[in-house]
Amino acid sequence: MAPCMLLLLLAAALAPTQTRAGPHSLRYFHTAVSRPGLGKPRFISVGYVDDTQFVRFDSDAENPRYEPRVRWMEQVEPEYWERNTQIAKGNEQIFRVNLRTALRYYNQSAGGSHTFQRMYGCEVGSDWRLLRGYEQYAYDGCDYIALNEDLKTWTAADMAALITKHKWEQAGDAERDRAYLEGTCVEWLRRYLQLGNATLPRTDSPKAHVTRHSRPEDKVTLRCWALGFYPADITLTWQLNGEELTQDMELVETRPAGDGTFQKWASVVVPLGKEQYYTCHVYHQGLPEPLTLRWEPPPSTVSNTVIIAVLVVLGAAIVTGAVVAFVMKMRRRNTGGKGGDYALAPGSQTSDLSLPDCKVMVHDPHSLA
């Protein structure tokens, strides 16, 4: 594996609802960060349905609890939150042990700050068959161990992870993971999609434009922006006379805009005076047809000050999105997508939904020890 930065069952009376055709995914991200001299490690857990964060737990909160991040989850009965809060607190203890174990495996001192992360979940197609299951761990921003696509074997990233691999193989942990990913995870994904049906199926088409930036040696940079789109999957390409410039294009990862939508840009360096020969093409499921854009010289009445102000605002939005970059990067690596912050959806129901007792909603992490 290449190193990477990991920077409800509805009440029976509720009628079935339609959801946007797949694929759909349910993923959870756990992060523990040690901070010597400042108390216990901080533990954060977030859950995503597709590109929307819907639950969160933070051990540093005044009253650490599993909490909803979208309005449609506020319909769920209190028992659900109590049960998941206890699960999250148990996971927090396992992650603290794993941090100490990793220090020993890597022969590191306890004086520095370290991170231990986990991502797990499932992705299904439009027929609700499992496309991919995930169970991955990282230490200090690099891959540690991961369940392979066959959901039967593990890949260890280094010699320390081999110790863990042998222990988990002997314990048969992959079988338990596979049962969760193929069964429980898919079922809960279906339930969450039903709960969020009014908002999760939405598509927001991108607003796109091209900016021009001066460079030395008679060159300019053309940057194609796509803003305000959802879901996160999008493709930006530059073409010269109809030929794609894949090798010469700079492309950033899709980033959350902070309002429940996403943003992305792609740029090329072109000869001064040849800007009109280059076209940007934007492909997104929210568009009836792909967009084709060229750089348009601004009217003479537009001052440089106004242009600079616009770019400053766009830059600030990008910085805001970087706060959750590791989640988006994991998503891009595992699904081929390029993906947020998360919009609070208008709730169509105000009463609590009664959820039948379900023993497993989230999946306990493994201990390295």
Curated annotation (Swiss-Prot):
Record's bilayer topology term: Single-pass type I membrane protein
> What residue intervals traverse the membrane?
306-328
Cell compartments where the protein resides = Membrane
Annotated region (Alpha-3), positions in chain: 204-295
What UniProt keywords are attached to this protein's entry? Disulfide bond, Glycoprotein, Immunity, Membrane, MHC I, Phosphoprotein, Signal, Transmembrane, Transmembrane helix
Q: In the record, which positions carry Phosphoserine? A: S351, S354
Q: Which residues lie on this side of the membrane: Cytoplasmic?
A: 329-369
Q: Which residues form the Ig-like C1-type domain?
A: 206-294
What Gene Ontology molecular function terms does this protein carry? Answer: peptide antigen binding
At which residues is glycosylation annotated? Answer: N107, N197
- Protein's UniProt keywords contain Coiled coil: no
| Subunit structure as annotated in this protein's UniProt entry | Heterodimer of an alpha chain and a beta chain (beta-2-microglobulin).
This chain's function reads: Involved in the presentation of foreign antigens to the immune system.
State the similarity comment: Belongs to the MHC class I family.
Name of the protein in its database record: H-2 class I histocompatibility antigen, K-K alpha chain
What is the scientific name of the source organism?
Mus musculus
